[in-house]
Amino acid sequence: MDFNMKKLASDAGIFFTRAVQFTEEKFGQAEKTELDAHFENLLARADSTKNWTERILRQTEVLLQPNPSARVEEFLYEKLDRKVPSRVTNGELLAQYMAEAASELGPNTPYGKTLMKVSEAEKRLGAAERDFIHTASLSFLTPLRNFLEGDWKTISKERRLLQNRRLDLDACKARLKKAKAAEAKATCEGDTVPDFQETRPRNYILSASASALWNDEVDKAEQELRAAQTEFDRQAEVTRLLLEGISSAHVNHLRCLHEFVKSQTTYYAQCYRHMLDLQKQLGSSQGAIFPGTFVGTTEPASPPLSSTSPTTTAATMPVVPTGAGLAPPEEAALCLEEVAPPASGTRKARVLYDYEAADSSELALLADELITVYSLPGMDPDWLIGERGNKKGKVPVTYLELLS
């Protein structure tokens, strides 16, 4: 019990000494040991890394989960060390509503069939989003969170300890300075020639004793200063090594950032592929749903393409006049070899990107090759008939640059 009380009293005295030193430094009444410029740069870089890591972490969480209530719920589950329940994505919820609407409105109607197709696509988009969130959380958010909750807490603890060691060092310096000043004053008083007519001899004896006491106090203060300096140097070296480890944290964050970009690229590529498949499905059935739809105008002339996009040029493509011998759009899609190009109204087009045919009715394309294109009545405006040699098939307009 006595030992605990002595330790408590000692800790209270140290805390009071540090508080006095800190207060005097703030008011400019005490000297402060300054760290070297390199150490200050390390501290500034560490603080900047911590601040920006927190911002990037929070904003990435917003990107992956825009709902703030859901983020708070996930945070509470993590703090309670409980598994976060599986959550339905917005795409999956939309797919569910569309499927239910198709079942109620009639799955065999054109609208119901389209709802079912879009529902399947939205379901795949929701699954891709779920995979992206899971991958990004593991490969990007978790390392950033581990840095803030692990490495940074260790750095902060050692920095606080270094601050305490510095306050102890400066307090020892101030104590030594005061002891030397008192010793010098006592020495001056002891060297004065006594005047026995006015002063009692015992006062000079007391002055000599005080000088000896201050000598002991100076020796004690110097010893405490050396010990405090040793502790400060040791703690400064430990803190310096931790701060220099921020470079390793940057390398780790860079690797995690590459993983995040990779997962995001995969996610958007999956979304693009799913939507492209959906667009093809809807385009193949559009002729049957809207049999009276025609593309463009019968005028062969068209303005220059330098200021128009590939999508808008489809509106200026010539259309094969409707004749008695021309098969319906559905039949033309199946018997493209029997479709003859119009005598006039064909155009040349340059392929912008490689395109792989999805089925036998489409024409595979290679970038930068030239093909002949034209349109048929009732075709989807996003598609044209392309010819290359003795091969022909449907080609997407967005992959072409129509030439004058």
From Swiss-Prot:
PANTHER family: DREBRIN-LIKE PROTEIN-RELATED, SH3 DOMAIN-CONTAINING. The keyword Acetylation applies. GO terms for cellular component: cytoplasm; glutamatergic synapse; membrane; postsynaptic endocytic zone. InterPro entries: AH/BAR_dom_sf (IPR027267), BAR_dom (IPR004148), Endophilin_B2_SH3 (IPR035640), Endophilin_SH3RF (IPR050384), SH3-like_dom_sf (IPR036028), SH3_domain (IPR001452). This is Endophilin-B2. The gene is Sh3glb2. Residues 344-404 form the SH3 domain. Homodimer, and heterodimer with SH3GLB1. Transmembrane segments: none annotated. GO terms for biological process: membrane organization; postsynaptic neurotransmitter receptor internalization. Keywords: Acetylation, Coiled coil, Cytoplasm, Phosphoprotein, SH3 domain. Belongs to the endophilin family. The modification Phosphoserine is found at S10, S404. Residues 1-27 are annotated as: Membrane-binding amphipathic helix.
